[in-house]
């Protein structure tokens, strides 16, 4: 009987243990859960997920990993993944800072300082991983030809610790970014509320103006056309009257100019006649005097010629 009870007790305990262990096995590991969140998150989280996957592969310390560690290929790949992660993280942080502009300056400075510290811790963790692998490569090269089992064991232990620290700091950074994003969203909502308060009166004025325009649009088309026609007719009459007045002014100005020109021409003609008479009074006495002198000279010449042609008396008679 005791044996039967002991068998039943063992069976019961085994069943309880199976029930207890079953949900534990079904729960995903924290690292796997975190990796799933990274793969479906922001660009910086995706880049960090690639770094995490590569680090898990390095931690296997397979023959291929050890070969690439000795050739510095692993450290180069980790450096590339680190730079990519930090670049995406800085870009995401800059976007959030732009969205935080409506938030108070003190709150924005505090959040930025906390986020900067978390970002620095994550970068230091990744740098520690890379430095530890560089150190391992140097140690292996120094022990060329000797057993490196102890070095691999120490490296595996260090990598496990670094992975836990990296996971913790990445989770902390994720939470701080979530707070940062919530603050940005709250600031954006405040900014929208302020814009609505400023634009509310303008929108109301626009609504009233639209209603006024709508009431004007409801008038009969014929009345509006007549009103426009009367305005246009009055405008044309005003323009025509101004044009006629301007033409009259131009005509008067042309007549004045013509009268002045005729007067000036008459004055010039009189001045020319007076000048001509003056010239004539100057030169007529000179001409008459020259004519008299010329006539006297001709008479003298003729007299001299006549005297020279008379016959000379002869002494023989």
Swiss-Prot record:
Residues 278-290 are annotated as: Specificity for association with VLDL. Sequence repeats lie at residues 80-101, 102-123, 124-145, 146-167, 168-189, 190-211, 212-233, 234-255. Residues 158-168 are annotated as: LDL and other lipoprotein receptors binding. Heparin binds at residues 162-165, 229-236. It comes from the Eukaryota. Residues 210-290 are annotated as: Lipid-binding and lipoprotein association. Residues 1-18 form the signal peptide. The modification Methionine sulfoxide is found at residue 143. It is found in: Secreted; Secreted, Extracellular space; Secreted, Extracellular space, Extracellular matrix; Extracellular vesicle. One of its GO terms (biological process) is high-density lipoprotein particle assembly. The modification Phosphoserine is found at residue 147. Belongs to the apolipoprotein A1/A4/E family. APOE is an apolipoprotein, a protein associating with lipid particles, that mainly functions in lipoprotein-mediated lipid transport between organs via the plasma and interstitial fluids. APOE is a core component of plasma lipoproteins and is involved in their production, conversion and clearance. Apolipoproteins are amphipathic molecules that interact both with lipids of the lipoprotein particle core and the aqueous environment of the plasma. Homotetramer. May interact with ABCA1; functionally associated with ABCA1 in the biogenesis of HDLs. May interact with APP/A4 amyloid-beta peptide; the interaction is extremely stable in vitro but its physiological significance is unclear. May interact with MAPT. May interact with MAP2. In the cerebrospinal fluid, interacts with secreted SORL1. Interacts with PMEL; this allows the loading of PMEL luminal fragment on ILVs to induce fibril nucleation. This is Apolipoprotein E. The lineage of its organism: Eukaryota, Metazoa, Chordata, Craniata, Vertebrata.
């Amino acid at each position: 009987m005791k044996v039967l009870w002991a068998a039943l007790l063992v069976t019961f305990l085994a069943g309880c243990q199976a029930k207890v262990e079953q949900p534990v096995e079904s729960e995903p590991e924290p690292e796997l859960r975190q990796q799933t969140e990274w793969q479906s998150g922001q660009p910086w989280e995706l880049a960090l997920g690639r770094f995490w996957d590569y680090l898990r592969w390095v931690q296997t310390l397979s023959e291929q990993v050890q070969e690439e560690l000795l050739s510095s290929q692993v450290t180069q790949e980790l450096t590339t993944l680190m730079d990519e992660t930090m670049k995406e993280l800085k870009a995401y942080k800059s976007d959030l800072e732009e969205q935080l502009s409506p938030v108070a300056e003190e709150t924005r400075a505090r959040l930025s300082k906390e986020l900067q510290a978390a970002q620095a811790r994550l970068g230091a963790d990744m740098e520690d991983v890379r430095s530890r692998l560089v150190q391992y490569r140097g140690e292996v090269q120094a022990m060329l030809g000797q057993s490196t089992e102890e070095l691999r064991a120490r490296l595996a232990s260090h990598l496990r610790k670094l992975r836990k620290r990296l996971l913790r700091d990445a989770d902390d950074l994720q939470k701080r970014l979530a707070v940062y994003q919530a603050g940005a969203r709250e600031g954006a909502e405040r900014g929208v509320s302020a814009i609505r308060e400023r634009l509310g009166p303008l929108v109301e004025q626009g609504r009233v103006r639209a209603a006024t325009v709508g009431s004007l649009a409801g008038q009969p088309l014929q009345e509006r056309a007549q009103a426009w026609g009367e305005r246009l007719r009055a405008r044309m009459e005003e323009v025509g009257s101004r044009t006629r007045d301007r033409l009259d002014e131009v005509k008067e100005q042309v007549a004045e100019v013509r009268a002045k020109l005729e007067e000036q021409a008459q004055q010039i003609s009189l001045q020319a006649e007076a000048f001509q008479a003056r010239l004539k009074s100057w030169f007529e006495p000179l001409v008459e005097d020259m004519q008299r002198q010329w006539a006297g000279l001709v008479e003298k010449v003729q007299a001299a010629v006549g005297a020279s042609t008379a016959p000379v008396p002869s002494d023989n008679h």
